[in-house]
């Protein structure tokens, strides 16, 4: 094992255990990068020896940007490959590594490959890499991932292959997993237990826990029939002798049996006689296994953002600059806005980033203070007055005044754009928790914010009346709040935060602000908040290509595609009929988003072929138990696509996902005017996506399409003009977040009422599990996603649906495919959905 220790920084408050620091932190980020750089230079010039595999999310794109900037500074040739799922990951690495079951090709492959370093960005932590890939001895895999839990095989196994896997720690491994009596001790005790391999009861016990500790990517798709063309990657992993599918268990016993079959390279190295010749009692063995089982049963969660980890690398190398800091801020904000980290964690990191901003930005003595920073100055004044009141001496009063002046000076120097070329980062003390409020009208932004929807119930007429009443109490007219934010009267914008904080609590809106950041982009556009950048980049990852969606174009736009690829307003104002023509809009209108028609047309034709050239499918299987009705989908599924058509559709989807990643990557290049224009236009696409998501969520609530079961709530999306959009896992996850947030207060009240009737003590931390299923007509599958929210706003619960989905697929023998890095999502055949959901219902407690 090689664990890359997290460097000391203001971003990391982890305290290393002195007893275990030597074994857990032999290398740090800088030494890991130095190894990568040395291997690249040893490979020679003109050789692309670094392969970067990145998952398609905002944090990963930001981290990839930071890493590639370092590689470019060092003149290291590299290649970026977006990886949207496990099958793409295996297909990509199959061109680099030899097949795992081909022992004869192992040496030849390792000697001929030019790739010396493979960097996994936001993927790989849950995989057992040494048993999944045949890693050449000359190649090193760097795992930089925020997904948790870790696969302990990568961290603590002692095979020779594990020496090629370098896992970058964010502090959790050294402080938690390596603590005395923790997961590392349990793993090592079981790995070197001399009797564990020979005892049949040990094997059966390990297998009995496979549903709760198995790899998320190793879905229970062994029940899938041979006619299903969409196989997950683990189904194609066969051992050479028996053809039996390898288990994806995290159990060290089952992993060790795999290594024994895979040859000498994967045999454990005995460190010493005392360490290897250990005989455990049955009680000890049971206790250590329980430690590992509890670790994997915690559910899916997130650690430090990968962009923050790469920023720490920049700090360690002395290369931290404004661009890397801004990308790290955007990556952190993306985790917070997607409810992957809680408010307390975000506040801790954002405070550290605020200090970095103050330290890294140039100063200006004549920069006036912006209106939205007045709350910071007010807090500074209050703190100074309190300090002066507590002290009776003039010295203390003078010190308080000096501190006040210093804070005022720092804020003024970091909160105002100086000139047309200013690209500084500014701290926003009270960033409004409203969706795209800088680009929408205030009323529209509040309407599309899930937190506001939860408190006011905007899907009811009464909720809309409350929203307008809130505006009236603030002294804002309907005309003003329906204007674009940039067109609102200046005095209203300056007083917006103060009035919201004073009046909104009367409506239950007590957490409408948080610490945020803004970036000035000079004369090209108005300053963009970190949340705005997150929304825009996320929209590009979802729909830059491949979907047809209408966006609102602003008025008074005159665009020419001859000057830039898409004119001044990019995809919003491109005329698809005549791309070379001048286009103009005097008044706001709707246009189809378009960054080029080739990929979108390929998806459309593939879907048409999959649904048109198919054979009849009669659904005769009875659905019992929960009676999940799938019969209504049959008219639309009069035909089921052939294997070839589905394969063509999936290849088209992969091309679209790759192109979307590169568009998002390009949008974060703030040195290019075209990239800034693309990022600005992506906000229009994000607005359109939010409209679709909120409209679908309100439709589910008002039509009472959400079923309340004993242990979770269930909603099935079977129809609608925008149904295809919700087969994208990120869009479905956004809808799930909106529903859980919007219904939080209602669900908590219902649970409190039920507990009162039963005279039951309410739980200290109530989870709000939600399952959404979206029909993909062309593939005859449902995309099923599980979401877990907390009853307390700002608190994040671990997601336990991964193990529940695996267990349900195994018990129900449903045909499923688990191909997303979001482990709480899975594809289920339409005819198997009822049995699958019923078994999930029995598993979730």
Curated annotation (Swiss-Prot):
Compartments where located: Nucleus
Region (Disordered): 193-283
GO cellular component annotations of the record: DNA replication preinitiation complex
Biased composition (Basic residues): 243-272
Main location class: nucleus
Stretches with biased composition (Basic and acidic residues): 202-212, 230-242
One Pfam family cited in the UniProt record for this chain: CDC45
Membrane spanning residue stretches: none
UniProt record, GO biological process: DNA replication initiation; double-strand break repair via break-induced replication; mitotic DNA replication preinitiation complex assembly
Keyword field: Cell cycle, DNA replication, Nucleus
KW Metal-binding (keyword) present: no
Entry similarity comment: Belongs to the CDC45 family.
Function noted in UniProt: Temperature-sensitive protein required for DNA synthesis. May be a transcription factor that regulates the level or influences the stability of DNA polymerases or auxiliary proteins.
Protein name (record): Protein TSD2
UniProt organism field: Mycosarcoma maydis
């Amino acid at each position: 094992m090689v664990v890359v220790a997290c460097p000391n920084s203001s971003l990391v408050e982890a305290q290393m255990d002195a007893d275990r620091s030597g074994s857990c932190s032999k290398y740090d980020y800088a030494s890991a990068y130095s190894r990568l750089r040395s291997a690249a230079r040893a490979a020679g010039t003109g050789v692309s020896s670094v392969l970067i595999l990145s998952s398609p999310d905002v944090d990963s794109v930001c981290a990839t940007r930071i890493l590639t900037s370092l590689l470019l500074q060092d003149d290291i040739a590299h290649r970026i490959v977006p990886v949207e799922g496990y099958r793409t990951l295996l297909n990509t690495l199959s061109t680099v590594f030899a097949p795992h079951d081909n022992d004869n090709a192992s040496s030849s492959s390792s000697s001929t490959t030019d790739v010396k370093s493979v960097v996994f960005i936001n993927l790989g932590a849950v995989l057992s890499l040494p048993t999944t890939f045949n890693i050449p001895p000359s190649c090193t895999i760097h795992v930089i991932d925020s997904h948790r839990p870790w696969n302990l095989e990568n961290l603590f196994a002692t095979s020779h292959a594990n020496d090629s896997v370098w896992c970058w720690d964010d502090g959790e491994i050294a402080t938690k997993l390596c603590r005395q009596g923790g997961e590392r001790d349990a793993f090592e005790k079981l790995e070197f237990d001399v009797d564990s391999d020979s005892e049949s009861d040990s094997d059966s016990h390990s297998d009995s826990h496979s549903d709760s500790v198995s790899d998320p990517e190793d879905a229970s798709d062994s029940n899938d029939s041979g006619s299903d063309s969409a196989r997950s990657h683990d189904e194609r992993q066969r051992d050479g002798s028996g053809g039996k599918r390898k288990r994806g268990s995290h159990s060290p016993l089952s992993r060790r049996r795999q290594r024994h079959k895979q040859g000498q390279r994967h045999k454990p190295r005995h460190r010493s006689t005392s360490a290897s010749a250990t005989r455990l009692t049955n009680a000890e063995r049971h206790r250590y296994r329980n430690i590992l089982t509890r670790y994997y049963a915690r559910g899916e969660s997130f650690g430090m953002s990968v962009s923050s980890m790469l920023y720490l690398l920049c700090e360690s190398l002395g290369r931290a600059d404004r661009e890397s800091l801004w990308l790290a801020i955007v990556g952190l904000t993306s985790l917070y806005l997607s409810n992957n980290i809680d408010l307390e964690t975000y506040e801790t990191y954002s405070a550290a980033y605020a200090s970095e901003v103050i330290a890294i930005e140039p100063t200006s003595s004549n920069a006036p203070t912006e209106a939205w920073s007045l709350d910071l100055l007010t807090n500074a004044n209050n703190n100074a007055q309190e300090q002066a009141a507590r002290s009776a001496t003039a010295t203390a009063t003078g010190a308080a005044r000096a501190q006040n002046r210093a804070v005022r000076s720092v804020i003024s120097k970091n909160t105002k754009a100086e000139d047309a070329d200013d690209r500084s980062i500014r701290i926003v003390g009270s960033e409004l928790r409203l969706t795209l409020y800088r680009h929408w009208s205030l009323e529209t932004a509040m309407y599309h914010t899930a937190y506001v929807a939860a408190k006011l119930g905007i899907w009811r007429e009464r909720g809309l009346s409350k929203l307008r009443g809130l505006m009236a109490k603030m002294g804002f007219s309907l005309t003003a709040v329906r204007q674009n934010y940039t067109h609102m009267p200046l005095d209203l914008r300056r007083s917006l935060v103060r009035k919201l904080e004073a009046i909104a609590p009367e409506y239950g809106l007590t957490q409408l602000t948080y610490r945020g950041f803004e970036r000035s982009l000079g004369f090209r556009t108005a300053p963009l908040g970190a949340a705005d950048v997150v929304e825009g980049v996320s929209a590009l990852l979802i729909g830059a290509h491949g979907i047809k969606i209408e966006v609102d174009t602003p008025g008074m736009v005159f665009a020419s595609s001859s000057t830039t690829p898409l004119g001044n307003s990019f995809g919003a104002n491109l005329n698809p009929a005549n791309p070379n023509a001048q286009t103009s809009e005097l008044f706001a209108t709707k246009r189809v988003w378009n960054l080029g028609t080739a990929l979108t047309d390929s998806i459309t034709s593939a879907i048409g072929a999959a649904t048109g050239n198919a054979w009849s499918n009669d659904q005769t299987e009875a659905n019992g138990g929960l009676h999940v009705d799938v019969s209504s989908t049959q008219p639309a599924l009069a035909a089921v696509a052939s294997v070839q058509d589905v394969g063509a559709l999936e290849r088209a989807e992969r091309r679209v996902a790759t192109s979307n990643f590169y568009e998002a990557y390009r949008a974060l290049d703030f040195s290019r005017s075209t990239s800034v224009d693309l990022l600005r236009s992506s906000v229009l696409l994000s607005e359109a996506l939010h409209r679709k998501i909120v409209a679908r969520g309100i439709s589910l609530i008002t039509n009472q399409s959400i079923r309340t079961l004993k242990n979770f709530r269930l909603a099935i999306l079977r129809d609608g003009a925008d149904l295809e959009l919700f087969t994208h896992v990120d869009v479905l996850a956004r809808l799930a977040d909106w529903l859980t947030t919007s219904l939080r207060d209602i669900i908590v009240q219902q649970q409190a009422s039920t507990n009162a009737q039963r005279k039951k003590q309410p739980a200290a931390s109530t989870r709000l599990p939600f399952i959404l299923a979206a029909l993909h007509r062309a593939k005859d599958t449902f995309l099923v996603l599980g979401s877990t929210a907390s009853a307390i706003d700002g608190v994040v619960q671990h997601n336990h649906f991964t193990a529940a989905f695996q267990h349900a697929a195994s018990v129900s023998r449903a045909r499923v495919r688990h191909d997303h890095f979001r482990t709480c999502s899975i594809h289920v055949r339409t005819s198997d959905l009822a049995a699958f959901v019923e078994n999930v219902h029995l598993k979730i407690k």
